[in-house]
Swiss-Prot record:
It is found in: Cytoplasm. Pathway: Carbohydrate degradation; glycolysis. Mg(2+) binds at E281, E312, D470. This is ADP-specific phosphofructokinase. Its cofactor is Mg(2+). Residues 4-486 form the ADPK domain. It catalyses: beta-D-fructose 6-phosphate + ADP = beta-D-fructose 1,6-bisphosphate + AMP + H(+). Binds 1 Mg(2+) ion per subunit. One of its GO terms (cellular component) is cytoplasm. Catalyzes the phosphorylation of fructose 6-phosphate to fructose 1,6-bisphosphate using ADP as the phosphate donor. It comes from Methanosarcina acetivorans (strain ATCC 35395 / DSM 2834 / JCM 12185 / C2A). One of its GO terms (biological process) is carbohydrate metabolic process. The active site is at D470 (proton acceptor). It holds the Pfam family ADP_PFK_GK.
Length: 491
């Protein structure tokens, strides 16, 4: 694989997608947005945090692997686990106690739009789409201020029994509280010492403490559901936030009620526009029962596309009964990319999907069901476009418009990602999934699926890591939909 060739392909793909985007009528994005309080940690910050506790207590809590943040010691333990492995993690907190403790003992550098649906809505708005309909069940006045003022982002609001699309600043629910998540970012090569043990952080990443207040419900307003046609025309929907569903609620309802309602929304969207494609963006889901329910009851058979990272592939495989493959994905090693590929194929089969898009540091894998309306090159272009967007976001911290996104073209293609793909070539050619020439283009042909593998652009020292995965998935999905619309128009 020639790195210069891939640089050229990125440029060509970016301009092809730019040309296709105006063909889209609009996108629907739901459900989760919040305010992110972001702190970039230094070694001094870490020493201070560790210093608040007895180090043997920290070690015990690390070994216990807390799955929620019930007290500050849980937070420090999960932070050390995340830093040791260099892996992103999202851990829920069900009270405001940790929020108050962090404000008092650490503080944040700045606040911005958070939550997958919020981040994706703002990105699509800035890419200049005609219309982006965002829907957040808990839209507060403060939260509404974090939507970008591009004029093309709208939110449904019920007025006198009628659903109208209005700018978020005119569509919020009065008197509702805001959901605030803490994002603790850390850098590669930071030295960490606790209880006599020292390690070096292997890569830039972050720990997210996800606020899950008791009043939070992942649901759609009944009147908005009944008048869902007011959202149209839209060409696609990107849905996320299902990780917020709880097993049981104080009012006696359970996760089953919210799963059922979520599926009803998906099915109604599809009935209103049979051409509509729906993408679910996965994230870290600590609760295994909820993780399995999301995959087998919401995603399987109901949506077209799934976006996720390496850890999420492993976690999904695990609850679907593929423990050995899951372990192989998470362990990485020399066969890591082969396991990741096999895992993505398995997810497509198990969940009956049209498309599975996996983003890993340095490369992306996209598995496609046979009979998809685009050529492999057109699919590849959509992935390369998203690679440029992600590079621009990592480089500058955000993307204000398509012109600014071009900065991503200056970021080099990852040589490590390219090397990972070259190691995978023997696996593909050995199984006759492609010829060496086809692999040079990133194309793989299975008996029941096709696949595209591309090396991505990677910023050595990113300004921010939050939202990069959402940018990759959203950029690729809308570029794909735009190309389908452009082809249908015959232009």
């Amino acid at each position: 694989m020639d790195i210069e060739e891939w640089e050229q392909r990125h440029a060509e793909a970016f301009y092809n997608a730019k040309e296709a985007l105006p063909y889209l009528d609009g996108m629907f994005v739901a459900y989760n947005s919040n305010i992110d309080a972001i702190r970039h940690l230094t070694e001094e910050d870490l020493s201070k945090l560790v210093g608040f506790f007895d180090e043997s207590d920290i070690q015990d809590r690390v070994a216990a692997y807390p799955r929620e943040i019930a007290e500050p010691l849980d937070f420090v333990a999960r932070l050390l686990i995340s830093m040791r492995e260099g892996k992103a993690a999202e851990v829920p907190a069900y009270t405001a106690d940790i929020h108050e403790w962090l404000k008092e003992h650490l503080g944040f550098d700045y606040a911005r739009m958070g939550g997958q649906a919020g981040i994706i809505s703002n990105l699509l708005g800035r890419l200049g789409l005609k219309k982006v309909v965002a829907y957040v069940p808990w839209l507060s006045e403060e939260q509404a201020e974090y939507f970008t003022a591009t004029g093309n982002i709208l939110h449904p609001k019920v007025e006198n029994g009628k659903v109208l699309l209005k700018p978020p600043g005119e569509a919020f629910k009065p008197g509702i509280g805001s959901k605030v998540n803490w994002i603790l970012e850390y850098s590669k090569d930071m030295n960490v010492t606790c209880a006599g043990n020292t390690f070096k952080v292997p890569r830039d990443n972050r720990l997210i403490i996800s606020s899950r207040p008791k009043w939070l419900r992942l649901d759609m307003d009944k009147q908005i559901y009944e008048q869902l046609d007011t959202l149209l025309p839209v060409d696609g929907a990107m849905l996320s936030g299902y990780q917020m569903i709880k097993e049981e609620y104080e009012d006696g309802s359970t996760y089953k009620d919210y799963v059922e309602n979520s599926v009803k929304v998906i099915e109604k969207l599809k009935s209103l526009n049979p051409e509509l494609r729906i993408h679910v963006e996965l994230t870290s889901i600590q609760n295994r029962l909820i993780r399995k329910a999301i995959l087998t009851e919401i995603v399987a058979r109901h949506v077209h596309s799934l976006g996720l990272d390496t850890v999420e592939v492993a976690n999904a495989l695990n609850v679907l009964g593929h423990e050995e493959l899951s372990y192989s994905v998470i362990r990485k090693g020399e066969n890591g990319i082969m396991s990741l590929y096999q895992g993505a194929v398995q997810l497509m089969k198990d969940l009956d999907l049209e498309r599975v898009h996996v983003h890993s540091l340095g490369f992306y894998i996209c598995i496609l069901a046979k009979g998809h309306p685009l050529t492999l090159k057109e699919h590849r272009d959509s992935l390369l476009f998203s690679s440029v967007l992600a590079a621009a976001q990592a480089l500058n911290g955000n993307i204000e418009n398509l012109a600014e996104a071009e900065a991503g073209l200056e970021v080099p293609v990852s040589s490590i990602g390219l090397e990972d793909l070259e190691n995978f070539q023997l696996y593909c050619t050995g199984r006759k999934l492609c010829t060496p020439d086809e692999f040079e283009y990133g194309y793989v042909y299975g008996s029941e699926h096709d696949a595209i593998l591309i090396p991505s652009k990677v910023v050595e020292r990113p300004k921010a890591t939050v939202g990069i995965g959402d940018t990759i998935s959203a950029g690729a999905f809308v570029a794909m939909l735009a190309k389908i619309k452009q082809k249908h128009s015959g232009k």
